[in-house]
């Protein structure tokens, strides 16, 4: 009997906590209007996930803790569409893809995307549909090591869009290895020979997500970097020179690929190039991509990069500092809001700490990072793991889609909405 009473007491305590959580999320802050929107059926966490997302974006102190007790978004819809090949109209509508240019300005300025993926199928779909518009073009590099079921599902989606294709040449991508750089080069070759015209190319990985809309990305490029490449970076610091002075060869122990150092020292860079260190992420003009694929300096630099550690952190920025390269920025530094990343080494200076968890030096975002993310001037953010914290991407995705549709200058198709009614209690224009 005493055990039964204890169980009942525990249930009562949980019920009281749930009521408090619900009232907390429903209670507006003083700056918010007391007028409430039309209300659908109440569930255990309010109008899930909108109200919880609103509380997270507004930085309400208890919201990240509350998020742990609420149900996670259900991804079965995405998997059901892709593991059951069928009518492409059903797939594009069911997965809420935008199927027309949203303004004349966007229709006249096409972007190319390179997306390298190897896991998290639902996250890939969320990323692609966030950046997808029919006037852009997308090259997907699927890691050769990815499971066949994963590859088949990606192919099912890609088959439904004329402007999305999978790279014909794939790599077994190694962390910090040359294959990461080669995967981008493979896609660039496909993009320049495709029938689609594009102005700039942007590279992404499967753990990135946009925090700016397509229109905002175009405005940023045109206003700040017209006909210029964005490759944030500086002359290689002394403390990381071992990455390029010592040889790092890829090898495969028990199925994983690594690029550890060996005892052989590298030859000097070709053409007496000054080596820079910077971001692996870029925004490049089409002419610069054509230069990368044809110029002897670029070809020799690519060959030299085959046995250095993390060559993608050196290759793009080094070549973009050449004065004769198309769109070059020889005097640039770290400027260029390409990616919002929280590094552990920068905690306290650049950001207020990771609210999720650090993997190596990089923050995998948690719900508590959302206020920082939406205030960032960057175009994209990294790093997300929906398998760990699915609500982070879900909140960003819903907010992003509302912003996209608010900026549209064409009639909105019903299937572009994620739900019939939105219950975000926040200002999207801040």
Curated annotation (Swiss-Prot):
Gene Ontology CC entries for this record: Golgi membrane
InterPro entries, per the entry: Glyco_trans_14
Name the record gives this protein: Probable beta-1,3-galactosyl-O-glycosyl-glycoprotein beta-1,6-N-acetylglucosaminyltransferase 7
An MF annotation (GO) of this entry: acetylglucosaminyltransferase activity
Pathway linked to the protein: Protein modification; protein glycosylation
Function of the molecule: Probable glycosyltransferase.
Organism (species): Homo sapiens
One Pfam family per UniProt: Branch
Chain coiled-coil ranges: none
């Amino acid at each position: 009997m005493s055990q039964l009473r204890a169980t009942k007491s525990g249930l009562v305590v949980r019920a009281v906590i749930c009521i408090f959580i619900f009232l907390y999320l429903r209670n507006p802050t003083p700056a918010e209007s007391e007028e409430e929107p039309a209300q659908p059926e109440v569930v255990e966490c309010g109008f899930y996930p909108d109200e919880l997302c609103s509380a997270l974006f507004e930085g309400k102190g208890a919201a990240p803790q509350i998020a742990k007790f609420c149900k996670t978004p259900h991804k079965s819809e995405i998997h059901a569409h892709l593991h059951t090949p069928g009518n492409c109209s059903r797939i594009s509508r069911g997965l809420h893809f935008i199927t027309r240019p949203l303004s004349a300005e966007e229709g006249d300025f096409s972007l190319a995307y390179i997306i390298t993926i190897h896991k998290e199928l639902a996250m890939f779909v969320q990323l692609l549909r966030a950046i997808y518009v029919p006037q852009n073009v997308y090259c997907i590099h699927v890691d050769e090591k990815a499971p066949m079921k994963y590859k088949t599902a990606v192919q099912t989606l890609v088959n439904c869009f004329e402007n999305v294709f999978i790279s014909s040449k794939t790599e077994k991508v190694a962390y910090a290895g040359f294959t990461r750089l080669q995967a981008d080069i493979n896609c660039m070759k496909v993009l320049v020979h495709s029938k689609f015209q594009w102005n700039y190319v942007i590279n992404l990985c499967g753990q990135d997500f946009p925090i700016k809309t397509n229109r905002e990305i175009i405005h940023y490029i045109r206003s700040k970097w017209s006909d210029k490449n964005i490759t944030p970076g500086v002359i290689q610091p002394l403390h990381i020179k071992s990455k390029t002075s010592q040889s790092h060869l890829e090898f495969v122990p028990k199925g994983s690929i690594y690029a550890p150092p060996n005892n052989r020292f590298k030859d000097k860079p070709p053409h007496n190039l000054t080596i820079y260190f910077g971001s692996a992420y870029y925004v490049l003009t089409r002419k610069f991509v054509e230069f990368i694929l044809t110029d002897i300096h670029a070809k020799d630099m690519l060959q030299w990069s085959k046995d250095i550690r993390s060559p993608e952190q050196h290759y793009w920025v080094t070549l973009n500092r050449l004065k004769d390269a198309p769109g070059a920025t020889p005097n640039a530094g770290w400027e260029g809001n390409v990616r919002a990343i929280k590094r552990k080494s920068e905690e306290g200076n650049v950001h207020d700490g990771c609210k999720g968890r650090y993997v190596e030096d990089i923050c995998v975002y948690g719900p508590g990072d959302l206020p920082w993310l939406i205030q960032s001037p960057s175009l994209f953010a990294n790093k997300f793991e929906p398998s760990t914290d699915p609500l982070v991407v879900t909140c960003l995705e819903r907010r992003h889609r509302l912003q996209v549709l608010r900026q549209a200058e064409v009639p909105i198709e019903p299937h572009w909405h994620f739900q019939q009614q939105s219950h975000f209690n926040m200002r999207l224009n801040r």
